[in-house]
Amino acid sequence: MAHPLRHVVHQGPVLRAMGSLAVQALEQRFRGVGSTPCDLEKSIDVELPPRDAAMVADYIRWTGGDRQAWKGQVPHHLFAQWALGLTHELLCGAPYPLAKAVNAGCRMEINGPIPLGEPLQVRASLEGIDDDGRRAVIRQRFVTGTPSSPNALVARLDALVPLGGKREGEKRTARPTVPAAAREIGTKLDYD
């Protein structure tokens, strides 16, 4: 892309979510992680404006795609551009340090094209949370469609949040150390 910041105006929801996450992380750091239970029945239904055609074209070019193959369509794998903005709203108040969350997987079920130039109808929902005390796996579901292509994409995002706890009865073992009397026997392995 010739102008890397050209499309930043289209990233408002994601940037707001990242800013809100940073504020939440600071609050959790100074006040402690809250204990507000997550509403597993919560879902968010929104209609988003059509994706900008120039942004989509630049995205296709940036990913090495064929613009002719995607002519008149939004690539399904661009869904994070609208889904991540909803993630924070969906998980707002979750009792987990979300700033530590890492991607634990993504599954996409493609049921049809996402036409370019049509508003997106998105339903975001929380599918479940698997918390074993050491880590929490948060499963979210995003269904995206348009008026002419409803339910075109069903995407599931999994996020893993390390909690730092230990299993019951698990003893902490000493970290392995190099003995003081050890000496180096080599520095290079030759595989020839």
Please report, for each region that a protein language model flagged, where it lies by residue.
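Hydrophobic/basic alpha-helical segments enriched in Actinobacteria
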Residues: 44-45, 51-55, 114, 121-122, ...
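Hot-dog-fold acyl-thioester-processing enzymes
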Residues: 1-103, 166-192
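Hydrophobic beta-sheet segments that form the core/acyl-binding groove
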Residues: 105-148
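Acyl-thioester-processing domains in fatty-acid/polyketide/NRPS systems
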Residues: 2-9, 68, 108, 146-157
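An exposed, glycine/acidic-rich loop-and-rim segment of catalytic or binding clefts
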Residues: 130, 135-192
